[in-house]
Every structure is written in structure tokens, then in C-alpha cells.
Amino acid sequence: MSRLIDLSHIIEDGMVTYKGLPGPHICDFWDREGSAANYDDGSTFQIGRIDMVANTGTYLDSPFHRYADGADLSELDLASLSGVPGTVIRRLDGSPIEPQHMEGRDVRGKAVLIHTGWDRHWRTDAYFGEHPHLTSEAADWLADRGAIIVGIDSCNIDNMHIRARPVHTRLLGAGIPICEHMTGLERLPDEGFRFAAVPPKVKGMGTFPVRAHAILD
């Protein structure tokens, strides 16, 4: 029997995912008390409303996030987002992930998930410090070897303390979606699972939260 492993953070009112971006505002558009007058059988309903930037919680970047002519969320191929064979690369000392840390792994046609353990700092100031990230050479290595989606449990797959974004540029330029702010990767085996991170089909947007998860058969 298959087992599901949740790899996503909970989205809560006011939480900060990325410094400088506003947290989400979650409220009732239609509350239960107000809805009661519309039904004769005692039924009540809540219709929620959320105001947020796309880069909230655990989210997926499509090529449109980086490139004006890249595929947006509505144009992504589901085959690259759901049921993808997965592999986990573990680098837990906080240092950058280089090609040598992935040598010997077959990543072609796979979801490559980078386990750094940085999610332990989620919703603390430390989360935005000197975080683990991929180098440009690691991005080249993954793109050249046919990875089809890449995820990380850190606050950015690039080094956000410099002004360049070579990893986003290389991976999204190769049509490889990126899933950031993941959690729970320590619960996965190195191999032998399938991965899913499917955003809603929104035209004209490059990023949106996902319920990232793994399926263990």
C-alpha cells in the first residue's frame, strides 16, 4: 500500500516566507453566521479569502518566473510535476551544493530533491541567514543530465545574498521547474519514491504555492 509524505509548510495568516515580501492575509469573505439566513435547513458555509504574493509557503517556480517568454503555470506539463521518480541529495553541513555532491547519481527524468535540513529554521531569522544553496556549476550538472524538476528545503535555491541568480537562470531556462521552501525531506529514502508538486493552472503567473508530497510504494 502506498504511503504519502507531506513535504510542504502550512500557510498561515501573516507569516513571512521571504523577507521583503508581505505575508498572506487570510479571512472570511462569507462567514458562517452571515450565510445562515440563505438556507432553510440550518446549513452554514464559510467562503474564505486570501490576499498573498505568489511566493508564499512551499511554492513552485515555472520558467515564466524568470523569463517573459517562458512557460507559465497554465502551460506546465503535468508529467514533470506529478508521479515523477525521485532522488534525494543530502548536504547537511550548510555549505553550497556542488557537482561532486551529486556524482554517481542518475538524475535523468527524475525529481532531484536537495535535503539540507535548513527547514529547521523555518519562521525564524536564521532562515534568512547564510543558507545552503546550489552553485551555478551544480545547476549546469543537473540540467545537462536531464533532471526534470528540482526542489530544496532552503529559503532559496540560489545564494540570495548576491545579486545574480544563476541557478534560477539555468534551470528555468532549461524548462526545469523549481520547488523551494520544502520540508520533511529527512523522511524520504534516497531513492524509490515518486514526487508531486502541482500548482493551479493560472495564466500569466510564474509561481504559486503547492502541496508538495512524495509517494512511497
Language-model regions, residue ranges each:
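Active-/binding-site microenvironments in catalytic and ligand-binding cores
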Residues: 1-217
